[in-house]
């Protein structure tokens, strides 16, 4: 058994200081039945806990660290910027540089506004959609998580799903009444909702790949159908690419699937490990945002030079060749996990989109949240604990996906497959 004495002690202390001992619920490791690991250091594809244990990391800070930990170019640039000042409350040139990169690479974005988190991005995009259309209702998908804004904490995924919560107390009934929810990948339900409420639906918000119920890609025609129905009814289509943005492809999920939304929300990768979000889209829509237009949004630290620098240095290193390597490595890991499960007769279904991978312990084809919930959660928890013993750090939730980075080597992937083989052999025995 791995020695985790220091992590156990740190968590005991933390529970007296913070709700549940953490600053984001999934970090408490509740659903996998073990004490959370307290991390001390990361380098490349590895992380090290405060007890000195080394792990191959597939959490990558929940996706942002697409070049792995302590990327030299990012770190050196941050040092240089920090010496000049961390924030000014005034524009800086690095904001222009990052905005230009985003606009060049994201098909839907003509103008972009930087914010501080993915939640800020989605909340701001919803306000913009409502203000632009003059409508009140939004349509989202069951099990899709778009941050913790009130309108979006209705049948959400991610940490909400991990804790088994359908919704969150504290969301006013009046707010919830303006959120329509339907099953992901169910285009007929979307069409029915528009037939009933189409004149008052401001937008449809969707993850191009549902990354917060595990990893659930869109079925053929689903995203295209959303584009068609929103255009038919004059509603906006918002892609929440906080997770998929620059993760699944060079041009994000919209480039990967060839569907262009009206607005796009970004986060994670564009911050390079620092707190960043963004939303952008067609110029005629984005010009409605203050100070160009009447729809208000602001932020004290929005566009701060540290975050902009980390984002710029992260994106500038991402080339089309990087994504070819992601595909090769992710396919290698996917096939290895599948073969290990098949060898031991373990029910499983594996989904992948680019460098995002989700393994479900079920025989069902996982195309929506109901199917994701058929996964054997007890088996997942046991599998998770065994993988920790083997030195592999996975997201501590069935409803989160694995992420690869440019720092992961073939040897890392081979070691991970070998660890899964050992874990599954033990659990099947």
From Swiss-Prot:
Enzyme superclass (EC): isomerase
Entry's Gene Ontology BP terms: protoporphyrinogen IX biosynthetic process
GO annotation, cellular component aspect: cytoplasm
Record's keyword annotation contains Cell membrane: no
GO molecular function: glutamate-1-semialdehyde 2,1-aminomutase activity; pyridoxal phosphate binding; transaminase activity
PANTHER family the UniProt entry points to: GLUTAMATE-1-SEMIALDEHYDE 2,1-AMINOMUTASE, GLUTAMATE-1-SEMIALDEHYDE 2,1-AMINOMUTASE 1, CHLOROPLASTIC-RELATED
Stated name of the protein: Glutamate-1-semialdehyde 2,1-aminomutase 2
């Amino acid at each position: 058994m791995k020695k985790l004495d220091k992590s156990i002690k740190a968590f005991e202390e933390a529970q007296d200081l913070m709700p549940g001992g953490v600053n984001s619920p999934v970090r408490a490791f509740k659903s996998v039945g073990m004490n959370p690991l307290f991390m001390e250091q990361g380098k490349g594809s590895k992380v090290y806990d405060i007890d000195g244990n080394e792990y191959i990391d597939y959490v990558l800070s929940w996706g942002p660290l697409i070049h792995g930990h302590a990327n030299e170019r990012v770190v050196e640039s941050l040092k240089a910027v920090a010496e000049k000042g961390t924030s000014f409350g005034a524009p800086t040139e690095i904001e222009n540089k990052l905005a230009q990169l985003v606009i060049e690479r994201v098909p839907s974005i003509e103008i972009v506004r930087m914010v501080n988190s993915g939640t800020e991005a989605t909340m701001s995009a919803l306000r913009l959609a409502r203000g632009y259309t003059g409508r009140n209702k939004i349509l989202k998908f069951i099990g899709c998580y778009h941050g913790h804004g009130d309108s979006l904490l209705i049948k959400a995924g991610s940490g909400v799903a991990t804790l088994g919560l359908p919704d969150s107390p504290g969301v006013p009934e009046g707010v919830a009444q303006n959120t329509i929810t339907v099953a992901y990948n169910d285009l007929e339900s979307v069409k029915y909702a528009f037939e009933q409420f189409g004149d008052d639906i401001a937008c449809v918000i969707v993850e191009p790949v549902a990354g917060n119920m595990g990893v659930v890609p869109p079925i053929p025609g689903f995203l295209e159908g959303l584009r068609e129905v929103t255009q038919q009814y004059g509603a906006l289509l918002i892609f929440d690419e906080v997770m998929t943005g620059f993760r699944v492809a060079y041009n994000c999920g919209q480039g990967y699937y060839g569907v262009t939304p009206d607005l796009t929300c970004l986060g994670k990768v564009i911050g390079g490990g620092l707190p960043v979000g963004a939303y952008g889209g067609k110029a005629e829509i984005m010009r409605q945002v203050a100070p160009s237009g009447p729809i208000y949004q602001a932020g004290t630290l929005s566009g701060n030079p540290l975050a902009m620098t980390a984002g710029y240095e992260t994106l500038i290193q991402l080339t089309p060749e990087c994504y070819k390597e992601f595909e090769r490595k992710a396919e290698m890991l996917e096939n290895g996990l599948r073969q290990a499960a098949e060898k031991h007769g373990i029910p499983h279904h594996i989904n992948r989109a680019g460098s995002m991978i989700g393994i479900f312990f079920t025989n069902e084809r996982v195309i929506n949240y109901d199917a994701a919930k058929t996964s054997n959660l007890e088996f997942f928890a046991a599998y998770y604990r065994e993988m920790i013993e083997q030195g592999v750090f996975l997201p501590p939730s069935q409803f989160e996906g694995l992420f690869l980075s440019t720092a992961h080597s073939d040897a890392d992937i081979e070691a991970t497959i070998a660890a899964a083989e050992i874990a599954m052999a033990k659990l099947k025995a």
